[in-house]
A protein has these predicted regions:
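Short strand-loop junctions, especially beta-strand C-caps/beta-turns
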Residues: 10-12, 152
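Glycine/proline-rich, flexible active-site/cofactor-binding loop segments
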Residues: 1-10
Length: 157
């Protein structure tokens, strides 16, 4: 490829970045030299429901990067979607609500189900500006080649 082929982490099973060994296996299995990881900071934050502040998020991200640095894999982090996502309270509330009042998804029309799923994902993956103590230092530590400020808009205005 003439471009960098980057894989983006997610917050559900697959490429969460929580397992260094699995990430190494994926990246080493890609048959191109121009490969790497697009770290979505909000997606990584969504792998826990315990974060309350941007500073909690920075500490959580740095702990993950410590593991990749120790494994000599930090150079694979070539891009970053820089965003804040502290949706843990919503996730805990939804889990409780769905346990108490299960939804029969088979009874919901497809497009309504799509709308509900999209709305649910937007309440988890908040795409807010990531501003706080240590954010700049975190970005400088990772030193990505590409940075996207990835924000969710509530309107077109």
């Amino acid at each position: 490829y003439p471009f960098d082929f980057l894989v983006e982490n997610l917050w559900w099973s697959g490429l969460t970045l929580k397992n260094v060994r699995l990430t190494r296996r994926l990246i080493e299995g890609m048959h191109t030299q121009k490969k790497g990881i697009m770290l979505d900071t909000g997606h990584y934050m969504n792998t826990t429901t315990q974060l309350k502040t941007p500073e909690d998020a920075v500490a959580y991200l740095n702990k993950m990067i410590d593991k990749y640095e120790k494994a000599q894999m930090l150079h694979w982090f070539k891009g970053m979607h820089l965003q804040l996502s502290l949706g843990g309270d919503y996730v805990r509330k939804q889990r409780k609500e769905w346990r108490e009042h299960p939804i029969d998804f088979d009874k919901i029309p497809f497009y309504e189900l799509f709308r509900l799923a999209y709305d649910h994902a937007c309440h988890i993956d908040l795409h807010q500006p990531f501003i706080g103590e240590g954010v700049r230092e975190f970005v400088e530590r990772v030193a990505p080649k590409y940075i996207t400020l990835e924000y969710q808009q509530n309107s077109r205005e």
